[in-house]
Amino acid sequence: VEKRFGHFFSQVKWLNMGGGHLMTHKDYDEDELIRILRDFRARYPHLRVILEPGSAFTWDTGCLVATVEDKVSNGGVNTLMLNVSFACHMPDCLEMPYKPAILGTHEPGEGEKRWRMGGNSCLAGDFYGDWAFDGGREPQVGDRIVFRDMIHYTMVKTTMFNGVTHPSIMIYSPSSGFRLVRKFGYEDYKGRMS
């Protein structure tokens, strides 16, 4: 930032250093961040420095559970059609792009069968990635697909494009199991349109 924009620092009062600071991640070097910020503030004491650590507070805290509705193979591409949408429910996957881990899968190696995940909207680009299932397992219609670490951005950037329903929001506790927090329906879509 200093190399490219340092000549502007005398003209501004604050500097936003952006988001994505995963301070709660086990491998994050907090001491290094503190050192960098202190050194920067010593050089530019008039600047108010802002960090956006948003996802640090939701790191690896939420899953999105989808169901396989259909399997399609076309031109050598294997796709699992899901009851969720990348465009509507996981826009960060398409925009950033962010590739979430899926429980029971891994990055496909040479020669492994690859599966693309397809969304349920009519948007032509509503699909993402390639995953291989552990142990060469063949996914089936009705299987649950568990996208890990999906609470950041997913909750705040969703859309109901063409009336695609949002997944329900649930909280899990080991002592009491799952508890429904919110179920979305047509009235939610209608309310957004008026």
Question: Each PLM stretch: what is its role?
Answer:
Residues V1-F9:
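Phosphate/pyrophosphate-binding loops at sites that engage ATP/ADP/AMP, CoA/4′-phosphopantetheine
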Residues K3, W14-M17, G142, P174:
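Solvent-exposed, well-ordered amphipathic alpha-helical segments
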Residues K3-R4, I34-Y44:
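Alpha-helix-loop-beta-strand connector modules within alpha/beta enzyme cores
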Residues F9-K13, P45-L47:
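Short, well-ordered coil/turn segments that N-cap beta-strands
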Residues L15-T24, P53-A56:
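Glycine-rich beta-strand-to-loop/alpha-helix junction loops that act as flexible
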Residues K26-D31:
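Metal-dependent catalytic neighborhoods of phosphoester/phosphodiester hydrolases
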Residues I36, R48-S194:
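Charged (often Lys/Glu-rich) extended helix/loop segments that serve as interaction or gating elements
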